Every structure is written in structure tokens, then in C-alpha cells.
């Protein structure tokens, strides 16, 4: 069976989409190719790396990447994680399903905010996997 492809997109591919990619590889990795990208690149937020390390998921080697049209076209599912990405995402081919899972941006906020958003993203991906 061929793996499906899921593509997590947010504004800067810095926090939310990085955490989603980490959770996605952990939870969906057997059945899905998991990628993340941004409309812009802001670098991977060190607090996102630290937050994921706290749940034993290593995203320290992730890079902050712009949306890759080849991956976009080959995706089975594109998930936008913020309203900016939802509104400004490139045109998605008709064969690709798109969903919006909105999460607060923890950048510049308290450590507990990173933990909360990390846990919310993880919970959503677990629910997605279970369905």
C-alpha cells in the first residue's frame, strides 16, 4: 500500500506546523508521508523544539521551508494551521483535500502557551488518526 501524504502549513513554518510535523511523523508515520511548510520562512522556533523534546519528539533537525508546489500537488491532504495560511495558501489542486485546523500562535508567548498549543496539536492529530 502506498503511503498517503499530509502537508501542514502555517505562516512561517516556525512553531505550529513544525510541531504538527513532529506529531504527524510520530503518530501517522507508518501510513503517511508528513511534511510542513510556510508561506514565509521564519526559522524553527527554539521553544517549539524544546516543547516537543518534552514529549520525546525530536524536531531539532527540522528546517523552516517554503511551500513546495511539487509536494503540494502530490499531497492527499493539506492542513492549514492558522487563518493567515488558510487565506493565503496557494491554489490547491482539485484532487487534494484541504482542511483548516486553527491553533493559536505561541510565538512570543509564555512557555505554558507553547505546551498548551503543542498538546492541542498532538490531540488533534491523534483524533485524526483514530478516525
UniProtKB/Swiss-Prot annotation:
Cellular component GO terms, alphabetical: cytoplasm
Record keywords: Arsenical resistance, Cytoplasm, Disulfide bond, Oxidoreductase, Plasmid, Redox-active center
Family stated for the protein in its record: Belongs to the low molecular weight phosphotyrosine protein phosphatase family. Thioredoxin-coupled ArsC subfamily.
Enzyme Commission number, as recorded: 1.20.4.4
Source organism: Staphylococcus saprophyticus subsp. saprophyticus (strain ATCC 15305 / DSM 20229 / NCIMB 8711 / NCTC 7292 / S-41)
NCBIfam families, sorted: arsC_pI258_fam, PRK13530.1
Disulfide bonds: 10-82, 82-89
PANTHER family (alphabetical): ARSENATE REDUCTASE
Listed name of the protein: Arsenate reductase 2
Amino acid at each position: 500500500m502506498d503511503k498517503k501524504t499530509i502537508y501542514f502549513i502555517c505562516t512561517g513554518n516556525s512553531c505550529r506546523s513544525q510541531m504538527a510535523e513532529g506529531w504527524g511523523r510520530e503518530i501517522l508515520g507508518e501510513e503517511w508521508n508528513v511534511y510542513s511548510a510556510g508561506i514565509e520562512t521564519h526559522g524553527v522556533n527554539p521553544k517549539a523544539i524544546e516543547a516537543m523534546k518534552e514529549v520525546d519528539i525530536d524536531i531539532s533537525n527540522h528546517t523552516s521551508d517554503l511551500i513546495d508546489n511539487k509536494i503540494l500537488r502530490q499531497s492527499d491532504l493539506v492542513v492549514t494551521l492558522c487563518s493567515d495560511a488558510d487565506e493565503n495558501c496557494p491554489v490547491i489542486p482539485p484532487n487534494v483535500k484541504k482542511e483548516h485546523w486553527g491553533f493559536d500562535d505561541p510565538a512570543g508567548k509564555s512557555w505554558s502557551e507553547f505546551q498548551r498549543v503543542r498538546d492541542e496539536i498532538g490531540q488533534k492529530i491523534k483524533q485524526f488518526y483514530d478516525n
